[in-house]
Amino acid sequence: MAGTLIISLDFELFWGMLDVCPLEKYQDHVLGGRKAIPELLALFQKYGIHATWATVGFLFARSAQEAASFFPEEALRPTYDDPALNSYAEFSKIGETDAPCFFAPSLIDLVAGTPGQEIGSHTFSHYYCKEKGQTAAQFAADMAAAKAIAAKHGHTLTSAVLPRNQCDPAYIRVLRDLGFTAYRGMEDNWVENKVHVHFPLRVLRLTDTYFPITGYGSYTPKQEDGIWNLRGTQMFRPIFKPLKFMEGLKVHRIKRQMLHAAKNGLTFHLWWHPHN
């Protein structure tokens, strides 16, 4: 039995960084990600690579007004204990010149028009399933909105990636009930399967990028409660400048993981963000 390579990209622009840093500090990364997408698509076409682009629902909109027309009713929007996580509140702050960091309908069309590329979901609002204060009902409303705005633009969503890989069984059942057939589950190792990450764990994650402290990570996919868990194996992390001289080790590690999956008929799931 041949091994399987899965590639997924978290297509989110600035929506995934709202609680991390101000736009002006990250804008160049986001705009660089926009420029990288056509180049990635050209490479994918050249080498016959199929990929799933897990897309934040807000990106389908051509304006804040269009996005707002798909908002769930107020009671069904996320009530996070930490208000910085609530991307619905961000729309009043988006200026005309900021739009390329928040909306991307033309890029979605470009991806969808490229052979072998699937438009998946990264939730409507970059929703956090394990943060305190929100509920499964609010998540269901958010995902229904994601499906609705995608459908308006001609896309049927069947694959999902939950932001920051915050997977919860009750929320996965919501995905199944909404017609999703697969999701990217959390990596099955002691370094990655944590929701909140402290500094020592970040160091271990970085180390695992270059050295196999968590092993190969390949697996046989399983269908659980009627939906396929295609869990991640390795994030293709961006270049860390102080360790740039070790990039060869990072690539070598990924190649070894891919080879192990190929030789043993297993699945290897590589993922990243376009702005990486």
Regions found by a protein language model. Give the residues of each.
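Catalytic alpha-helical scaffold of carbohydrate-active enzymes acting on polysaccharides/glycoconjugates
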Residues: M1-S159, R164-L230, M246-W272
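Positively charged, amphipathic and often flexible ligand-engagement surfaces
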Residues: T233-F236
